[in-house]
């Protein structure tokens, strides 16, 4: 029931949003994160947090709402995936990388699924629009490459998970193989 409630909650919170530079409803991303976590046999809490992972950062959701509806553990997982938008892009990304090194397994799994969904989307969009893809982001391609490579390195202890292997492979293709 928690997963069902999280889907409804996230769908309502993200209802007017689109994926960056596309007409794709934003909710597709949390649903893909849910699918990735499910395929990798993750816990219900990780799956619920994966569905909700962008609600604090990208909507008007308050932490108390998540804690009341889903509990403190899920709130903490969601908070671990949320960035402080008052900081610069580089500061936010460096903070994420630094924290990941000491984070819990569940936090790392949610992060890995989120980044895999993002990198899949970037790769598919690159196939459609080429180098114009990089114009959508708040950082140039070389900084995105640094970030995704650093995230992949920080998640290296997930190397027994299928999603990690796909993340590592897709990051390599997108940033090392394609010009």
Give the role of each language-model region.
Residues 1-179:
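Active-site helical microenvironments for divalent-metal-assisted chemistry
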